[in-house]
Curated annotation (Swiss-Prot):
GO MF, one example: ferric iron binding
Gene: cyaY
Coiled-coil ranges from the UniProt annotation: none
One Pfam entry name: Frataxin_Cyay
Keywords, ordered alphabetically: Iron, Metal-binding
Species of provenance: Photorhabdus laumondii subsp. laumondii (strain DSM 15139 / CIP 105565 / TT01) (Photorhabdus luminescens subsp. laumondii)
Function summary: Involved in iron-sulfur (Fe-S) cluster assembly. May act as a regulator of Fe-S biogenesis.
Disulfide bonds: none
Superkingdom of this protein's organism: Bacteria
GO BP terms in the entry: iron-sulfur cluster assembly
Entries under InterPro entries matching the protein: CyaY, Frataxin/CyaY, Frataxin/CyaY_sf, Frataxin_CS
Entry annotated with the keyword Iron: yes
Protein name: Iron-sulfur cluster assembly protein CyaY
Any single GO CC term annotated in Swiss-Prot or TrEMBL for this entry: cytosol
Amino acid sequence: MNDSEFHQLADQLILYIEGQLDNYDGNADIDCETNGGVMTLSFDNDSKIIINRQEPFHQIWLATKGGGYHFDYKEGQWICDRSGDNFLTMLAYAITEQSGEQFSFP
């Protein structure tokens, strides 16, 4: 993958997350801000989730209360380089844990 392909895939992921959060109709207050390629999700309990792109490694990094994770693009999805879990699955779990309300991506 070249840098241009990486940025296109990373942009698609960020736009998808933003769209899902915009359509979220649950009770938890989840604020979403994207600035300079870094997405910050903020919750009522003052916890945050940070999603950012690491261009030199062609990775997406996820920082949650539970820890930090690095994701590589493999076979059409972002996969954790340690656990092998899907990015959206891990993000949904982190949002559920930090918001106190069940969250999932379609």
